[in-house]
Amino acid sequence: MAAFRIFGISLLVTVAALVVGYAHGGVNDLFLLLVLAALEVSLSFDNAIINAAILKQMSRFWRQMFLTIGILIAVFGMRLLFPLLIVWATAGIDPVRAMELALHPPAHGALEFPDGSPSYEKLILAAHPQIAAFGGTFLLTLFLEFIVYDRDIKWLKWIEAPFARIGRLGQVSVVMVVAALVLAATHLTHSGNERATVLTAGLLGLVTYLVVNGLSRALRPPDVDTVTAGKAVGMAGLTLFFYLEVLDAAFSFDGVTGAFALTSDPIVIALGLGLVGSMFVRSITIFLVQQEALDRYVYLEHGAHWAIGALAVIMLLSIEQRFEIPEAVTASVGVVFIGAAFGWSVLRNRRSTRVSAPGP
């Protein structure tokens, strides 16, 4: 019953989105919408686990904000407005004109119009190296910050223990991210201009993570369980909310760019990735929090971070088109890590139960 209450709204939103999708483009858009929603959920399950780890520290008010205002930001901000802003920043085409290009693409799926001008899809694909550098760097920093922290519970001890020792040096994760970014920009770009834009985008991704994460740590109360109300609590909740939205943005880059392999229609992308997909990801997040899944299955958060690390590497490699990996493979990697972490957690719980069980 609890699961139905959590996912019921997502199901209602899905039905409404399917009706709008069918009215917009018939059966074809209906099918694309469902495929994009499945793509978003499969790519973002690790995102849901990380969200749950943060959301359990937030008050009921900020959880509601995440499910209401947050979903509006996900739909209209990241899945609809973000691609338009990318076209504006990289090609100098204002968002209104970019929307016109998106809604009226060339015939037969061509990447150019008869006069030789680029389509909306081509403009987005041309900006992929910068998008991949920003998102990949942000997520790689998130992964390394988790791995180099010396925590009591370790999953892949043979890797995590050495990284935790290295982490004592301080800011080692930043050094490793910068090194990875320089390697990617040096070996995966084809011109000085492209190298400069990739480096700039990657450094912006790193700075964004450091600023947002730094603010969330500075404003987070020492004991979140005692949080009730007041200015400090409000600022702490607001910062964590902002952190979740930036995190969602970084995760959405791969889905948004991957969606163009299926369609360049911004309405279908916003409905499939944003409305249906993001709503289900948020429902999964709430379900994990209410079921206390991260406390019961202690390796889940580790598996999610390893999945994030894999996604970050895949995004950075995709700066070079030859190394672009299909979204189905990307999603499968995340599922494997999270599935393995869940299985290890179950085995750990069984061993703990046997050890604590009274003897005959």
Predicted segments with their positions:
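Multi-pass alpha-helical transmembrane bundle typical of ion/small-solute transporters
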Residues: 1-360
